[in-house]
């Protein structure tokens, strides 16, 4: 689809008064029919894709935000029957135009959304049955994820590098234009310019949700230079500069947050950046000591509407598993999957629960689960507590989670550890460091095994990305 066509679909879903939908859809179909008749082969493909996507939208989660939103429109909302009627007319038009494959795709994807666990999770949260939202843990494919309820997206050097590799026909010309505009003398500045393009494209897709929810949802995470994880001053300068560029690109306050590393320097960055009203997402973060340090800094200093504290589930569980295997724990592969669960239960109890329930009642930053390795990372993160729980999910893990119907328990986070599991986990030094509130001092965060591994991977990917930007 073209950018113009995407904008048309956004208007239909987010900016159309429910009572005007039938007329707006009819006008859209008429325009597409007229354009199709005189279009080139490539343009016809774009039109057919846009028609199919508009049909899928009607049976997706997207209407929940506006067209079916009673808090905005009272009882004057669209019924599912009205949406289905528009779906049928759009699919019929595709077949009339000879685009049977796109018609079949629209029907198939609409059926997939109907049975999607992720879509069901979003709807349950919108209805108040749970308080858990999910996002796309990938730099591309956001619009398809939004159809299943995604309300945020994350980017990091690895993901941006993957995005340009997967779609070189799109991103290579963008890179070439940025080279011509900025030159190649400052690779970091050029890298940020490219990252901003990825972020802005995603931010525009999520911006209506951000507006509708009063800036509570609809954010894009943008990672600061991972090579500067020890340099607070430089990260702060870069955040301020990038934020200014995002304001210009988006025409107002950016619906973005900065990913800051869970290091000692990162604490200073989180304090300074959130004090300026810019949200953060703490990454390279695996432990209760890190969560306590960052939650406290954000709670004390932040004037931003939203910040997140990501826990990188699999990036902790995997090295814990290595230590358990070395210690002779026979069922280490199963035991390691409970490491993050144990930490998350303690974290939420300590930081999110209100004082009357033994917690600190922090509300300026929300916990976010990421880097999951299987369905358990999702089902054991579901919650209905006072602070929203967020999850970002890799595309392949989205498919895995949706491959069969799953029970979505609003209290899934509190699934009890199997008997003896905590004792086995304690045989891992990495787990003990992560689980105990005083397991590490801030100066140790950067050398913590999962942190060191992740920072190296992010740094290597960042170097590869800058190499492509400047010389590729």
PLM segments and residue spans:
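N- or domain-start disorder-to-order transition segments that initiate the globular core
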Residues: 85, 89-137
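Phosphate/adenylate-binding glycine loop and adjacent helical scaffold
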Residues: 145
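Conserved, mostly hydrophobic/aromatic
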Residues: 156, 222, 258, 273, ...
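Catalytic alpha/beta core domains of metabolic enzymes, predominantly
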Residues: 263, 279-412
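Active-site-adjacent beta->alpha loops and helix N-cap segments on the catalytic face
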Residues: 231-235, 260-274, 287-298
């Amino acid at each position: 689809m073209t950018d113009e066509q995407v904008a048309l679909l956004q208007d239909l879903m987010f900016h159309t008064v429910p009572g005007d939908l039938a007329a707006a859809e009819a006008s859209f179909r008429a325009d597409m029919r007229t354009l199709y008749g005189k279009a080139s082969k490539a343009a016809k493909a774009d039109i057919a894709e846009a028609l199919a996507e508009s049909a899928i939208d009607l049976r997706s989660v997207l209407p929940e935000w506006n067209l079916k939103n009673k808090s905005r429109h009272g009882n004057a909302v669209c019924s599912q029957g009205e949406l289905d009627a528009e779906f049928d007319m759009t699919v019929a038009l595709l077949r009339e135009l000879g685009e049977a494959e796109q018609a079949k795709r629209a029907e198939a994807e609409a059926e997939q959304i109907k049975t999607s666990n992720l879509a069901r999770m979003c709807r349950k949260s919108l209805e108040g049955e749970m308080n858990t939202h999910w996002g796309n843990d990938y730099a591309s494919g956001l619009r398809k994820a939004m159809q299943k309820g995604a309300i945020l997206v994350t980017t990091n050097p690895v993901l941006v590098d993957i995005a340009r590799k997967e779609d070189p026909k799109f991103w290579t010309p963008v890179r070439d234009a940025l080279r011509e505009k900025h030159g190649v003398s400052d690779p970091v500045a050029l890298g940020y310019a490219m990252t901003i393009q990825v972020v802005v494209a995603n931010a525009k897709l999520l911006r209506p949700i951000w507006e509708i929810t009063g800036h509570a949802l609809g954010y894009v995470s943008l990672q600061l230079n991972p090579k500067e994880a020890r340099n607070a001053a430089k990260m702060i300068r870069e955040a301020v500069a990038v934020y200014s560029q995002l304001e210009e690109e988006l025409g107002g306050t950016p619906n973005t947050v900065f990913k800051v590393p869970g290091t000692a320097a990162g604490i200073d960055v989180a304090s300074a950046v959130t004090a300026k009203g810019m949200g953060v997402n703490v990454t390279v973060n695996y432990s209760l000591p890190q969560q306590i340090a960052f939650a406290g800094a954000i709670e004390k200093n932040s004037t931003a509407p939203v910040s997140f504290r990501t826990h990188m589930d699999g990036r902790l569980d995997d090295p814990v598993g290595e230590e358990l295997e070395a210690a002779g724990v026979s069922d280490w592969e199963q035991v390691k999957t409970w490491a993050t669960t144990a930490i998350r239960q303690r974290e939420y109890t300590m930081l999110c629960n209100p004082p009357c329930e033994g917690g600190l009642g922090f509300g300026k930053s929300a916990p976010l689960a990421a880097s999951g390795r299987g369905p358990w990372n999702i089902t054991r993160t579901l919650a209905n507590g006072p602070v929203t729980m967020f999850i970002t999910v890799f595309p392949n893990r989205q498919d895995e989670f949706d491959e069969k119907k799953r029970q979505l328990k609003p209290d899934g986070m509190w699934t009890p550890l199997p008997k003896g599991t905590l004792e086995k986990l304690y045989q891992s030094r990495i787990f003990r460091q992560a689980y105990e509130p005083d397991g590490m001092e801030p100066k140790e965060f950067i050398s913590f095994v999962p942190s060191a591994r992740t920072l190296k991977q992010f740094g290597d990917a960042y170097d590869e990305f800058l190499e492509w930007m400047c010389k590729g």
